[in-house]
């Protein structure tokens, strides 16, 4: 199973059940015939931006963040260190080796405002539909850094 399919399965499980630990999530994935290492699961959870909430009985469980003022997930924002814009293009700077991870996160969300991404080692080019969208996304990212 590829990464995108696996992460979509994780989202499906998190949305349908109260999962309180990584071990519970790993078990639910195995019931779905998806086998992952603890390291892979941990990385997927970080990239998806999962966070813990408490229900009325005080039980902690994982949730998927809802996008607020930006289309980018908390996981994507985690990787962005600097942002620059020119016309309809955004340039995101990341730590070395993280630009491709950020590209995968952005591409997997399939936002209509973004035409595509091109990743280097620590730089990501984001091609937006137009200059207005690029400007708005730049502002959103800057306000969330």
From Swiss-Prot:
It holds the Pfam family Arg_repressor. One of its GO terms (cellular component) is cytoplasm. Keywords: Amino-acid biosynthesis, Arginine biosynthesis, Cytoplasm, DNA-binding, Repressor, Transcription, Transcription regulation. Pathway: Amino-acid biosynthesis; L-arginine biosynthesis [regulation]. InterPro entries: Arg_repress (IPR001669), Arg_repress_C (IPR020899), Arg_repress_C_sf (IPR036251), Arg_repress_DNA-bd (IPR020900), WH-like_DNA-bd_sf (IPR036388), WH_DNA-bd_sf (IPR036390). Disulfide bonds: none annotated. It is found in: Cytoplasm. GO terms for biological process: L-arginine biosynthetic process; protein complex oligomerization; regulation of arginine biosynthetic process. Its main location: cytoplasm. One of its GO terms (molecular function) is DNA-binding transcription factor activity. Belongs to the ArgR family. Regulates arginine biosynthesis genes. NCBIfam families: argR_whole. This is Arginine repressor. It comes from Streptococcus mutans serotype c (strain ATCC 700610 / UA159). The gene is argR.
């Amino acid at each position: 199973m590829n990464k995108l399919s696996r992460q979509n399965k994780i989202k499906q499980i998190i949305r349908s059940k109260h999962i309180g630990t990584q071990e519970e999530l790993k078990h639910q994935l195995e019931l779905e015939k998806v086998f992952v290492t603890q390291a892979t699961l941990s990385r997927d959870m970080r990239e998806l931006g999962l966070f813990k909430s408490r229900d009325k009985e005080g039980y902690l469980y994982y949730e998927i963040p809802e996008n607020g003022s930006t289309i980018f997930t908390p996981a994507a924002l985690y990787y962005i260190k600097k942002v620059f814009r020119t016309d309809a293009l955004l340039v995101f700077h990341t730590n070395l080796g993280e630009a491709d991870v950020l590209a995968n996160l952005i591409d997997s969300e399939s936002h209509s405002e973004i035409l595509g991404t091109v990743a280097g080692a620590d730089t990501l080019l984001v091609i937006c539909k137009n200059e207005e969208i690029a400007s708005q996304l730049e502002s959103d990212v800057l306000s969330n850094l």
